[in-house]
Amino acid sequence: SAMAAEFGRLDPVPAVVTPVYRLKSETIHNPAVVKTLLAHDGRALYFSRSAIPHVRDVDPSEWHQHTSYWGHVGMYGFRGDVLTIWDQLPASPLEDLERLEQLRLIEAGYTIATFVVEGTSLSVDTPEQLEEARLLAGAA
């Protein structure tokens, strides 16, 4: 799998790997779409429901013209030892604020590596997304 290949490519082996995809301009301000802020080496610096980074002195409708925005697919590949300690880590204030479980690892100092995939997956986290999924299922 792509996640297993990423574990083998990286040295040192990260705690977690997860796929990201390039966001379209119409989705960067949607709080139901989780955004990922990436370092130059592909490490996830932060995950948020807000558009990150914020582009100062530019109308938000034009932010996508100044930087790339990355969406989080929501699948993970974990190093074995990380799975065993996950529930022992203290609850994270950022995790509670954003309602994003991966922030617990970020705040605890663990590395989350990313790799780019084409397209996106369908998330069903809101009533609106459930309706969209029902429409897509009916069209299939």
Model-derived features: positions:
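Conserved core of the sugar-phosphate nucleotidyltransferase
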Residues: 1-89
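Conserved alpha/beta core of the MobA/IspD/sugar-nucleotide pyrophosphorylase nucleotidyltransferase superfamily
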Residues: 63-140
